Amino acid sequence: MTGTDLPSIYRSYIACLNARDWPGLGRFVHTEARYNGRRIGLSGYREMLEKDCDEIPDLHFDIRLLIAEPPHIASRLQFDCSPKGVFLGLPVNGRRISFSENVFYEFLDERIANVWSVIDKAAIEAQLMNDSKGAAPEQAKRFP
């Protein structure tokens, strides 16, 4: 796999997520996929994403940084969304929040086999704290 192939595959994967093309997910995710060290397989991966989109109807994956060193991808994804209810243990309850996810992927046979994800929960906590104090949402953002 060349360095030019991997970014293209990854961008197509993100387009698949944003289109909610769950039947097409198998083109990008390995049947034995692992997420943060736990084997969830393609079906578990799909269930996780479907649940995320159900809980966050306006979820959109925005690539802000993409680095490829085959067979790995490192990406910083940006989100600006309104989760229903509790998100990451926080009572968001439909408020609009912005946060990033730093995520690393390992590809096998041109499909995602391993994912390591870290979400900036502190950014969400700061926004919720500022919102509860009456600050404008723009003041609560920690990053552009």
Residue ranges and their predicted role:
Residues 1-144:
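C-terminal and inter-domain tail/linker signature
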